[in-house]
Design a protein with these regions (language model features):
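Conserved AMP-binding/adenylation subdomain of ANL enzymes
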Residues: 170-187, 195-233, 248-249
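AMP-binding/adenylate-forming catalytic core of the ANL superfamily
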Residues: 85, 102-104, 235, 341, ...
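Conserved pre-ATP/AMP-binding loop-to-beta segment of ANL
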Residues: 16, 134-151, 158, 181-187
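Gly/Ser/Thr-rich phosphate-binding loop
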Residues: 208, 232-236, 246-307, 318
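Conserved AMP-binding A3 loop
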Residues: 28-30, 147-174
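Conserved ATP/PPi-binding loop(s) of AMP-dependent carboxylate-activating enzymes
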Residues: 312-316, 327-358, 395
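Conserved beta-loop-beta connector loops within the AMP-binding
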Residues: 320-338, 374-375, 437-441, 476
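Conserved AMP-binding/adenylate-forming
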Residues: 25, 40-85, 394
Length: 494
């Protein structure tokens, strides 16, 4: 089965069931399948062929979903473009992917057009979806052919294109549904952009089960309004955005009693956020772990949540924790997470060296560190490339951030290492405070010392109105680290 035939199958069984809602607009499965088929034929009429890359530069909407499903139906490879990227960054993705055509929403089209000027292979930028009829034949698509290239910033200077086939991406959605990580029915709220693996998975999972997906750009008030209006049963949230949902629910409570599952992932979930979410939403966030290259890998089951843990490996995931030599580490000791699963990528587009580093002896090497407790639960210990080494001691940025989040004045925290000639690296924390909160850098340092060893306590705390975010909404530690070179982006607290 391919993603396109999945939609057709669901539409045949439930043609009149709402597939997607966005604002006041709704489209049924029958309408979505018919529109996607007609658009797929039009794309093929333009000279595109199966395997060609189609760039998609569009916000979460019915139009965006239609473009994705049309690309999948035509056998094209969808190349989502992050809406926050600048023209030079978009140009790199155009060039690296070899995309021949791009659909860019009207407000975003100037950026795409500027980027395309430097890319001879990019033939057309379109900011409207055509409605012309076409009789082009829809090809049979091999499930093992690429369906999407998801560009991930990771920890390198240039983004890498993660390739997923129709089969591997449908395995991701199936694994999420089978493990109850994704709600298998009801109404799913899709606020994570579809250029993010989790955002696309939520939308396709709804098609997998014949559910309805409500598409909402992230705005805390709009998200909560949509939950109340559509009686949503599920959503996925990045921890950094979860903080803002709690603040908005405190400011103006909505009826969120319809919710059954809320999954947090993409970064560690502070215990303070868990506590506040439970207080104001009435149940616990279910923390999980995954990555663009491997799909959903671990999850806290609803009947046995361990706060602070990333959960248990999913049933279809072989997961090991290994030392730098590739040997399994003892229980309780940190090791790199390596996995083998039908959900994992074929590799990075046009980057054999990075692919060889990622995939070794059939195992996907995540670069993430964790330890396993006696009951098999996994506890995230940070990324190997983000570990701060101070005087020979390893310090996890996430552990320091967790301590800072316990302070009631802290809304956001990001911790990085600053090079130092004596200690190797110093611990530096960037903090954004809650509206109306007041605390000094020394006050936060004293608070942190109550929860951390002396060598883990930040030597410096710098305040920002808000922390910079990466393309997926996570705190951008790389930008924070670069700002330390001049200190131009922050002012030290008194």
């Amino acid at each position: 089965m391919t993603i396109g035939t999945l939609l057709h199958s669901t539409a045949t069984a439930n043609p009149n069931h709402p597939a997607l809602c966005a604002g006041p607009d709704t489209i049924t499965y029958g309408e979505l399948d018919d529109s996607a088929t007609r658009l797929a034929r039009w794309l093929l009429d333009q000279g595109l062929r199966p395997g060609d890359r189609l760039a998609l530069h569009w916000h979460n909407s019915i139009e965006a979903a239609l473009l994705y499903f049309a690309a999948f139906r035509a056998g094209l490879i969808a190349v989502p473009i992050n809406l926050r990227l600048k023209p030079a960054e978009v140009a790199f993705i155009f060039e690296n992917s070899g995309a021949a055509m791009c659909f860019s929403a009207p407000a975003l089209a100037p950026c795409a057009e500027h980027a395309a000027a430097a890319c001879p292979a990019m033939r057309r930028i379109l900011s409207a979806i055509p409605t012309a009829a076409s009789s082009a034949a829809i090809p049979d698509v091999d499930p093992d052919r690429p369906a999407v290239i998801l560009y991930t910033s990771g920890t390198t200077a240039r983004p890498k294109g993660v390739v997923h086939t129709h089969r591997s991406f449908l395995e991701i959605t199936r694994a999420g549904i089978d493990s109850h990580l994704i709600c298998g029915g009801g109404v799913s709220l899709a606020m994570t952009p579809m250029m993010h693996a989790a955002g696309l998975a939520v939308t396709i999972s709804a098609v997998h089960t014949g559910a309805t997906a409500v598409l909402v750009p992230f705005d805390a008030g709009a998200v909560l309004d949509a939950i109340e209006r559509h009686r949503c049963t599920f959503f996925f949230v990045l921890p950094a955005l979860g903080q803002f949902l709690v603040e908005e629910q405190i400011r103006r409570p909505r009826d969120v009693s319809s919710l059954q599952i809320v999954v947090a992932g993409g970064d560690t979930v502070p215990a303070a956020l868990q506590q506040r979410f439970h207080q104001h939403f009435g149940f616990q966030l279910q923390e999980g772990y995954g990555l663009t290259e491997g799909g959903f890998l671990a999850f806290n089951p609803s009947h046995a949540i361990r706060i602070g843990s990333i959960g248990l490996p999913l049933a279809n995931v072989e997961l090991r924790l290994v030392d730098p030599t590739g040997r399994d580490v003892p229980e309780g000791e940190p090791g790199e997470i390596v996995v083998r699963t039908p959900c994992m990528t074929n590799g990075y587009w046009n980057d054999p060296a990075a692919t060889a580093d990622l995939m070794r002896d059939g195992w996907l090497h995540t670069g993430d560190l964790a330890h396993r407790d006696p009951d098999g639960y996994l506890w995230f210990r940070g990324r190997s490339k983000q570990i701060i080494i101070r005087a020979g001691s390893n310090i996890s940025p996430q552990e320091v951030e967790e301590a800072l989040y316990r302070h009631p004045a802290v809304l956001e925290a990001g911790v990085v290492g600053q090079p130092d000639p004596v200690y190797g690296e110093l611990v530096v924390a960037f903090v954004a405070l809650r509206p109306g909160a007041d605390v000094t850098a020394s006050g936060l340092q004293n608070f942190a010392r109550e929860h951390l060893a002396d060598y883990k306590t930040p030597e410096r705390i710098l305040f920002l109105p808000q922390l910079p975010k990466g393309p997926t909404g996570k705190v951008d530690r790389r930008t924070l680290k670069e700002s330390l070179r001049t200190d131009s982006a922050a002012t030290a607290g008194a």
